[in-house]
Each structure stands twice: as C-alpha cells, then as structure tokens.
Regions:
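C-terminal regulatory/interaction module of P-loop NTP-utilizing enzymes
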Residues: 1-201
Length: 201
C-alpha cells in the first residue's frame, strides 16, 4: 500500500489563484483558522511534513490572484465562535442588510413553489415583525422560507382564516425571534405574530 497526498481546497486555491469561499467561518474554533494568518498576511502557505514524500515542512508561495471570501453570522448566534482579532485585521468586513422586499418575494416564490401573491404575504408578515421593534432577534428570510415550505407540504394557504397557516407562522416566527428559550417571551411573540397575521394576511 502506498500513500498518495491530495491537496485540499485551500492549497489548490492558493496554488492556482482561485477564490476560496469559506462559509460561516465563525463556526470553526479560532485555532482552526490559524493557517489563514500567514496566507493573508505574508502570502505563504505552510505545508505539512511528508507531503509527496518530502521529509520536512515546505512552503507554498500564494498565487497573486488568490482571494478569499468569508461569511459569518453575528456572534450572538448559537454555535458561532468569536473570530480572532488577528484574522479580522487581515480582512475587509462588510455588514450586509436584509434583502429588499422584491428580492425576498422572488426567493420565497422560487424556492417554495408558492404563488407570488402568497409569497408576498409571507414576506410582508416577516418584514412587519422585523420592524415591530419587539423582537429579541430579527427574523431572517430563512423563517419566511420555512413557513412557505411547510405550507406547501401541508396544502395550507397564506390566510388569516387558515388555522394551519396561523400555527405554522406563529411557531416558526416565535422560535426564530428568541434564543433564550423564555416561555413568556415565546407566548408574547406568538401573540404579536397573530396580530400581524390579521393585518397582513
């Protein structure tokens, strides 16, 4: 049996000048990202010993066209780690806002298979909850997608008169806007969603 070294995506991107997309990088422990420091600062990748039969560590000069895109959720999200200051100092950070209404409608319509008129109501409901100023955490488009997909599976309609829709929307949005697990907050959130359903659906 013989060993065969296979370069990972990071090595390939550094070698050939590709763009590395590192999705939700703050889910990794900070020490797991240490190798990125020399790549971004000194433009050198430290390769492991015994790579391709070599006995000592060697280095790869990072291609001048190499770029990296890192995505992350805010640090207060469950499961995220605080990013190293040293790593943040080596990147440009852009805070992204929510999509505009038209884009959210298009995403929910295309990913759920619901009619555009129903996607509009879901988007307006989620956006109204965001703007209410009463959420511990603001609901994202994911909450709207979950509602839309659950409705499609259950054959329910986006209507204040549809009990299945009301339950689905209240359950998902109350859960999406709270991270503390407080029963009082959950009930308060369900009540707020019920009121918004009357206004927007």
């Amino acid at each position: 049996m013989s060993k065969a070294w296979a370069d990972n995506r990071l090595t390939i991107a550094c070698k050939y000048g590709f763009t590395l997309i590192y999705d939700e990088f703050t889910r990794s422990k900070p020490e797991a990202n240490n190798t990125l420091l020399s790549i971004l600062q000194e433009r050198v990748l430290d390769l492991p010993a015994a790579r391709n039969g070599e006995d000592a560590n060697c280095y790869l000069k990072v291609h001048p066209k190499f770029t990296a895109i890192f995505t992350s959720n805010p640090e207060e999200y469950a499961g995220t780690q605080k990013a190293q200051d040293a790593l943040r100092d080596r990147m440009v950070t852009m805070d992204l806002d929510y999509f505009d209404r038209t884009t959210e409608i298009g995403i929910i319509e295309s990913k759920s298979g619901l009619e555009k008129s129903e996607a509009k109501k879901i988007v307006d409901l989620v956006r109204a909850l965001r703007k209410s100023g009463q959420c511990e955490f603001l609901p994202t488009i994911r909450a709207g997608l979950m509602i839309a997909k659950a409705l499609k599976i259950n054959g329910a309609k986006v209507s204040a008169d549809d009990l299945i829709f009301r339950e689905i929307a209240q359950d998902i949005l109350a859960s999406a806007t709270s991270r503390l697990g407080s029963k009082d907050y959950y009930q308060k959130s369900r009540k707020l969603v019920a009121e918004l359903i009357e206004n927007y659906c």
